[in-house]
Amino acid sequence: MTAVEPRPVPQLEATRPYPARTGPKGSFLYKMVTTTDPKVLGTMYLVTAMSFFMIGGLMALLMRGELARPGLQFLSPEQFNQLFTMHGTIMLLFYATAIVFGFANIILPLQIGAPDVAFPRLNAFSYWLYAFGATMATAGFITPGGAADFGWTAYVPLTDILHSPGVGTDLWILGLAVSGLGTILGGVNMLTTVVCLRAPGMTMFRMPIFTWNIAVTSVLVLLAFPLLTAALFGLAYDRHLGGHIYDPATGGILLYQHLFWFFGHPEVYIIALPFFGIVSEIFPVFSRKPIFGYTTLVYATLGIAALSIAVWAHHMYATGAVLLPYFSFMTFLIAVPTGVKFFNWIGTMWRGQLTFESPMLWSLGFLVTFLFGGLSGVILASPPLDFHVTDSYFVVAHFHYVLFGTIVFATFAGIYFWFPKITGRMVDERLAKWHFWATFVGFHTTFLVQHWLGAEGMPRRYADYLPSDGFTTLNTISTIGAFVLGASMLPFIWNIFKSYRYGEVVTVDDPWGYGNSLEWATTCPPPRHNFYELPRIRSERPAFELHYPHMIERMRAEAHVGWGSGKHGTPQDDDALLAKK
């Protein structure tokens, strides 16, 4: 018998959408530090912002643990002050604002058919300014006097050298100035990219709603953030150079409030409008319908942006120094374009073929939660009602319903929606739905009861209360909900790790099947410069037309925006125009 050499058995290897290694060992960190690829920078924004979200969430759990029962449990009033100051700062400026630029860097160039952003190196510089500024402000916790402890609004005279002598205050001021500069430069970059780098055929009214919202947000950034920077430099000048810019004797306290809130209210829409754009991308895909009222959505976005810079002093009703009828009327008015958006989102789903994958669930959670927050906002817009609940937990509940409802729900909707495009792998739908329901139940348990706490008179920012105040039961319920909310992040973290390493590999351009915008017309993940070839752009749905060419004539015939409406000519006119270019 002759021995036969055994045939080699092929070794099983995990398939990966990326090569196992693209350079010498240890080069990953160098590439990350020196990259100008907007997709890599966007991922870095997302990871950094979500890390700060977790840190801010841990601070919230410490505060809720302290407030669960009357009496001081484990925090001193000074520590409590530091926690709510840094919690607000981190969540608004280091999580919400930053994650906007995470999504914008990854998705916006893809949606307009651009190979890169307008200023790639400035883009990288913006990220590192944000990262260093955020780290600087948070580093106050390791200084002898602790972190900033005057509330995230930093009202004067709480921030002067007499009342806040510690280094933590200076780190907070400088950290916000540095990260704010990064935000300003990011806004310049995104606006220039939208104006200058759109693909042939991509007119303004063929841009996706998300791109429109990022462009409008960038304009608001350029209006609002320089004012914050100026106000912060004024604080530093008063603290260390003996200035009297915010001297109470000359009305400096109200001057600071006007400066801060002229930044602060547009900031709310800077961190809301992009997430309106995210859900506007998701609803059509999972309703199997085009977006309802595309043009109206664009004008509603412009209306919200215009009104957002006209209502800043509704945060100052209690000062008695603002024109109540004007600011109340303008605040009521801002509900109109927001209501138009709700009408369009519901119209998009109306009689659609709905499927409830995780991005759609999170978007519906956004709708419900943001609606509640908007209704309590209408209450607060009325001065007679606002006077009774100002600086109470009613305001805390409203603020979290509006911002958590908008930002966090839409953040997770966007992450689950674009995760296949970013990584080339699908997420685990079962874990994503567990994550959604735990977050939804935990959030509403935490913050719904805080409306009643505020109506009963519990002030915000207090570290303690008396058993006789009658706040114990509702505070206990709120704390239980907060810990459910905190635990809901565990399936998310595991899902992202598991899906990135072992998730099902995406082999098609559009894993959801009904994508409309251009990011669904390139590979998952996209190449370095986004596209190997671009499809013709003849409407606001180029990817859908690419994948379903037999639907084009019907779409033209039924269009309200596009060639069928008679507003823009014919497809042949479009071809002739492209040939001239």
Swiss-Prot record:
Cofactor field: Cu(2+); heme
Transmembrane segments annotated in the record for this chain: 43-63, 90-110, 128-148, 171-191, 214-234, 259-279, 291-311, 320-340, 360-380, 399-419, 434-454, 477-497
CDD domains hit by this protein: Ubiquinol_Oxidase_I (cd01662)
Keywords, sorted A to Z: Cell membrane, Copper, Electron transport, Heme, Iron, Membrane, Metal-binding, Respiratory chain, Translocase, Transmembrane, Transmembrane helix, Transport
Cofactor note: Binds 1 copper B ion per subunit.
Binding site for Fe(II)-heme a: 87, 400
Region spans: Disordered: 1-20
GO cellular component: plasma membrane
Pathway recorded for this protein: Energy metabolism; oxidative phosphorylation
A GO MF term: cytochrome-c oxidase activity
GO annotation terms (biological process): electron transport coupled proton transport; oxidative phosphorylation; respiratory electron transport chain
Residues involved in heme a3 binding: 398
Chain sites annotated for binding Cu cation: 265, 269, 314-315
Subcellular localization: Cell membrane
Role summary: Cytochrome c oxidase is the component of the respiratory chain that catalyzes the reduction of oxygen to water. Subunits 1-3 form the functional core of the enzyme complex. CO I is the catalytic subunit of the enzyme. Electrons originating in cytochrome c are transferred via the copper A center of subunit 2 and heme A of subunit 1 to the bimetallic center formed by heme A3 and copper B.
Family note: Belongs to the heme-copper respiratory oxidase family.
Subunit-level organization: Associates with subunits II, III and IV to form cytochrome c oxidase.
Descriptive protein name: Probable cytochrome c oxidase subunit 1-alpha
Organism field: Nocardia farcinica (strain IFM 10152)
Encoding gene, per UniProt annotation: ctaD1
